[in-house]
């Protein structure tokens, strides 16, 4: 699957944005997806590409010629597509993507994800989109969309369905199209194994999400295993128990 990410060419005022961008790139690569992005080596864009490439992933950059003239392109990409202008760059990135994510960024990021939302809403393109709302960055956008709905400019059902993903756990569930396990609930795995969910935590270094759970069959033990185990039909024995490597940040965020 191709995941198109829109994000800032600047790094922002807090170092956590760069950490999140790098972890997002690594997450995309480790889950077997191809990253599509704007092709730059600067700011968050460069960190995103570095994370994917260093995790062994495929990265497609789409860069307009005038940025090439300024030598802003990332030199290590799997593929670099050069377009004549920004308009064709945006179209190329939409044509290549299956899922579209808005990471923290500026005016250009808002322009790009807004065009995707409009095209999907008008049934002019297929694909799913979401805002990566790490540390609440896109809460003002969420409030604006709600205001549009309250004032009658967009349908209420559509406004309520726009995804704002606060963590890598939520991103994993969104991409796989599955519900997210929640602390306190009983979870039935595909082999009818029953688990009690105790907690979820993101690994701040890699973006991987882990679930702390207790088995409700056989030996009643606590485990910590990747979220992917709960969202796919794979036996839990295929995933290592990582209780001895607990170093995770809570999903409140790296910026906290």
Where are these regions (language model features)?
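A cross-family phosphate/adenosyl-ligand binding-site feature
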Residues: 1-96, 134-168, 172
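Mixed-charge, low-complexity intrinsically disordered regions
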Residues: 27, 177-256
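Small/polar loops that bind or transfer phosphate-bearing groups
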Residues: 36-37, 104-105, 133, 189
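Short, structured loop/turn "capping" segments at alpha-beta junctions
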Residues: 59, 124-127
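Active-site/ligand-binding-proximal alpha/beta "capping" segment
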Residues: 88-122, 130, 177-179
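Short Gly/Pro-enriched loop/turn and capping motifs at secondary-structure junctions
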Residues: 107-108, 134-139, 203-204, 218
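Short loop-to-beta-strand entry elements in the cores of soluble alpha/beta enzymes
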Residues: 127-135
């Amino acid at each position: 699957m191709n995941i198109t990410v829109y994000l800032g060419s600047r790094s922002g005022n807090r170092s956590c944005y760069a950490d999140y961008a790098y972890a997002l790139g690594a997450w995309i690569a480790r889950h077997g997806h191809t990253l599509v992005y704007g092709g730059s080596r600067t700011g968050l864009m460069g960190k995103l590409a570095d994370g994917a490439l260093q995790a062994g992933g495929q990265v497609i950059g789409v860069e307009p010629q005038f940025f090439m003239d300024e030598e802003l392109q990332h030199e290590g990409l799997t593929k670099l597509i050069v377009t004549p202008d920004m308009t064709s760059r945006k179209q190329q990135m939409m044509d290549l993507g299956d899922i579209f994510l808005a990471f923290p960024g500026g005016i250009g990021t808002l322009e790009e994800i807004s065009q995707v939302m409009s095209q999907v809403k008008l049934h002019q393109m297929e694909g799913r989109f979401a805002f990566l709302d790490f540390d609440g960055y896109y809460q003002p956008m969420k409030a604006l969309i709600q205001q549009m709905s309250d004032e009658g400019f967009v349908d209420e059902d559509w406004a309520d369905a726009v995804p704002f993903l606060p963590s890598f756990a939520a991103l994993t569930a969104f991409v796989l199209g599955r519900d997210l396990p929640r602390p306190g609930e009983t979870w039935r795995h595909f082999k009818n194994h029953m688990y009690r969910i105790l907690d979820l935590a993101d690994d701040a270094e890699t973006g991987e999400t882990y679930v702390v759970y207790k088995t409700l069959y056989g030996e009643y033990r606590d485990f910590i295993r990747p979220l992917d185990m709960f969202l796919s039909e794979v036996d839990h024995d295929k995933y290592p128990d990582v209780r001895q490597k607990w170093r995770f940040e809570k999903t409140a965020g790296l910026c906290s």
